[in-house]
From Swiss-Prot:
Lineage: Eukaryota, Metazoa, Chordata, Craniata, Vertebrata
Protein name according to UniProt: Large ribosomal subunit protein eL15
Underlying gene: rpl15
Family from the record: Belongs to the eukaryotic ribosomal protein eL15 family.
Any one biological process term the GO annotation gives: cytoplasmic translation
GO function terms (MF aspect): RNA binding; structural constituent of ribosome
């Protein structure tokens, strides 16, 4: 096995003594830092490389801290107005994952960069920590790379805001196989519309 495979196996056993100690120390370290900061290198180089990271110019890693738990509806003094069925304020669950929230924050902070992907690096009772891979679309090392130049096109601006990253697609229910029948045709809405539209084809 190569070195990256050994690292992957270490990360798969998160309950081992080594990883439990390491994750506790790292979570303490991350809590002392700001909620969004640039990491000098990926904490999990094996995972980052599987997601498209390359250790060369134009690639950046940002570490994001996201508060765990549900999402309270942002209304003044709990006044939602309308019918009682929609009065919920406290026990509201956000439609997207905390990982996609981390990607969004990184994309907002680094507006000129493109979000490629992200991965989990730790969590405690209050926070989850993710590392986000960002790419500079104007760097020559990226523009001249046939494997990475797709992200330089304008259509990929702020893909994290539109649910086009891996974490975003997961929240949209997109995927292959029998578990993803609700989104055949591109989205939940497209699948619902097709199944609920009566088509009487004309006999010719």
């Amino acid at each position: 096995m190569g070195a990256y495979k050994y690292m992957q196996e270490l990360w798969r056993k998160k309950q081992s003594d080594v990883m439990r100690f390491l994750l506790r120390v790292r979570c303490w370290q991350y809590r002392q830092l700001s909620g969004l900061h640039r990491a000098p290198r990926p904490t999990r180089p094996d995972k980052a490389r599987r997601l498209g990271y390359k250790a060369k110019q134009g690639y950046v890693i940002y570490r994001i801290r996201v508060r765990r738990g549900g999402r309270k509806r942002p209304v003044p003094k709990g006044a939602t107005y309308g019918k009682p069925v929609h009065h919920g304020v406290n026990q509201i669950k956000f439609a997207r994952s905390l990982q996609s929230t981390a990607e969004e924050r990184a994309g907002r902070h680094c507006g000129a960069l493109r979000v490629l992907n992200s991965y989990w690096v730790g969590e405690d009772s209050t926070y989850k920590f993710f590392e986000v891979i960002l790419i500079d679309p104007f760097h020559k090392a990226v523009r001249r790379d046939p494997d990475a130049q797709w992200i330089t096109k304008a259509v990929h601006k702020h893909r994290e805001m539109r649910g086009l990253t891996s974490a975003g697609k997961k929240s949209r229910g997109l995927g292959k196989g029998h578990k993803f029948h609700l989104t055949i045709g591109g989205s939940r809405r497209a699948a619902w519309r097709r199944r609920n539209t009566l088509q009487l084809h004309r006999y010719r």
